[in-house]
Amino acid sequence: MSGRSVPHAHPATAEYEFANPSRLGEQRFGEGLLPEEILTPTLYHGYYVRPRAAPAGEGSRAGASELRLSEGKFQAFLDVSHFTPDEVTVRTVDNLLEVSARHPQRLDRHGFVSREFCRTYVLPADVDPWRVRAALSHDGILNLEAPRGGRHLDTEVNEVYISLLPAPPDPEEEEEAAIVEP
């Protein structure tokens, strides 16, 4: 009995299979369950219960995100099919690439829904944020791409001078000086 162990990995360990995913899926928030999701047995991964099979048909990739890093370029793919092109915003702030989208409440097959999300990617040190390009495919997949420079971009360090302020006068010394002066 002592030689047996239950296979289990804590999410904070390197052995945990979802510790550093390159793909994020199952982000269909607020869309309801399909019949095959209810009746399908689940897999238990310690802390996360998920359907055994991904639902088939349209919408199975809704919200999916994939990140690819190669020697030549940085690439991220993000499913934004629930949004129109004018509802999606892409911007860079320093070495961060931010994708956000928002649409007001509207009617869908389950009732009324409003959606909003913001995903931020950290760009590798050798990617120039000014060279990021975005393209949206006909099926709602946003392709974010930037060439990797092969060299780390210099970071600007601004060293701020610290000036020393004079100490405030001591109240006792002021009283003594006032007594001596008359």
From Swiss-Prot:
Expressed preferentially in skeletal muscle and heart but not in the lens. Its main location: cytoplasm. One of its GO terms (cellular component) is cytosol. It comes from the Eukaryota. GO terms for molecular function: enzyme activator activity; structural constituent of eye lens; unfolded protein binding. One of its GO terms (biological process) is response to unfolded protein. Keywords: Cytoplasm, Nucleus, Stress response. Residues 55-163 form the sHSP domain. InterPro entries: A-crystallin/Hsp20_dom, Alpha-crystallin/sHSP_animal, Alpha-crystallin_N, HSP20-like_chaperone. It holds the Pfam family HSP20. It is found in: Cytoplasm; Nucleus. May regulate the kinase DMPK. Belongs to the small heat shock protein (HSP20) family. Interacts with DMPK; may enhance its kinase activity. This is Heat shock protein beta-2.
